[in-house]
From Swiss-Prot:
Residues 35-38 are annotated as: Interaction with substrate tRNA. The record marks 98, 120 as: Interaction with substrate tRNA. InterPro entries: Dimethylallyltransferase, IPT, P-loop_NTPase. Keywords: ATP-binding, Magnesium, Nucleotide-binding, Transferase, tRNA processing. The keyword Nucleus does not apply. The keyword Nucleotide-binding applies. This is tRNA dimethylallyltransferase. The gene is miaA. It catalyses: adenosine(37) in tRNA + dimethylallyl diphosphate = N(6)-dimethylallyladenosine(37) in tRNA + diphosphate.
């Protein structure tokens, strides 16, 4: 059987995960996560992990919030899961909206040297002492190319600083000169881009639902771990605002409104990235039904649904 992969991506709250769960009801497949926050355990509500994780769901909630994780480590894990799916003759369906993970999947990763733990510690301590804005300015002062990074993307600016400190060379230079080897050749990339008004309404409603369930308890759990605010899991949608609410710095509804606004802005940036950074043969869909119908039409005959599934 041909080694195929389907990638279903899109902005936060677009409905891609729900679409994949519906696809899995009619297709013999594995749903493999490529969301950089849904990898963490202990925060399923905050990170909007599948409500009922089945044996077909892979790479959800398996990383400790305190663990230092990266797109490179995720790529190793996803290669293993994809190979296992192929060995079991089921279709790997990779879903999530994290640009770093999607980019590493479709374009590969540059061969940047490993960062010394002391360099990483120094960079993180400097970020904590300076704050995000001043840290970004310090980075740009040393590497003008870093101005191309978004100042609120803490992970990227921290990574750029670490690489510059470790190697003396801009991360952009590494990206340009290091050959990227694509991990997979036969990826069909599908993007779910609902109309903006529907997407924003879904974001607003989803965050209210999160706040009414266990999101606050999950943030309390993260705070009990004494994680720095620049830790990746602390950047989950709503986490910074809930922390401020729990610390008495803002009111409940203010936290809700700020989180909704920040998430809408993030979704807007995601939409721009999907339209400009993905391969030219990427296909775009405006509704769940369209993307579900496409996947089933393309793959149902090759991967018919069976009553028993491998439990690897």
């Amino acid at each position: 059987m041909e080694k195929e992969i389907v990638v279903v991506t899109g902005p936060t709250a677009s409905g891609k995960s729900a679409a994949c769960d519906i696809i899995a009801d009619d297709l013999n497949c594995r749903v493999i996560n490529c969301d950089s926050k849904q990898i963490y355990h202990g925060v399923p509500i905050l990170t909007d992990q599948p409500v009922s994780v089945r044996d077909i769901h892979k790479l959800y909630g398996y990383v400790a919030p305190t663990q230092n994780y990266s797109a490179g480590l995720w790529l190793q894990d996803v290669k293993r899961e994809v190979q296992q799916a192929w060995d079991d003759n089921v279709l790997p369906v990779i879903t999530g909206g994290s640009g770093m993970y999607i980019n590493s999947l479709v374009n590969g990763i540059s061969d940047i040297p490993a960062i010394d733990p002391e360099v990483r510690k120094t960079a993180r301590n400097l970020l904590e002492s300076l704050g995000n804005a001043a840290f970004y300015e310090a980075l740009v002062a040393r590497d003008s190319n870093a101005a191309r990074l978004h100042h609120n993307n803490t992970h990227q600016i921290l990574r750029a600083f670490e690489v510059l400190e470790q190697t003396g060379t801009s991360i952009f230079t590494w990206w340009e000169r290091s050959p990227r080897i694509k991990p997979f050749e036969n990826c069909e990339v599908l993007v779910l881009l609902p109309p903006r008004n529907k997407l924003y309404d879904k974001i607003n409603r989803r965050f209210l639902t999160m706040m009414q369930t266990d999101a606050i308890s999950e943030v309390k759990y993260l705070m009990s771990l004494n994680l720095p605010m620049h830790a990746p899991v602390m950047k989950a949608h709503g986490a910074p605002e809930i922390v401020q609410y729990l610390q008495g710095k803002i009111e409940f509804m203010e936290a809700v409104e700020i989180a909704q606004k920040n998430t809408r802005h993030y979704a807007k940036r995601q939409c721009t990235w999907f339209r400009t950074q993905l391969p030219c043969d990427t296909r775009f869909f405006s509704s769940q039904n369209e993307i579900i119908d496409h996947v089933l039409a393309q793959y149902a005959s090759k991967y018919p649904r069976t009553h028993t599934r491998p439990c690897n």
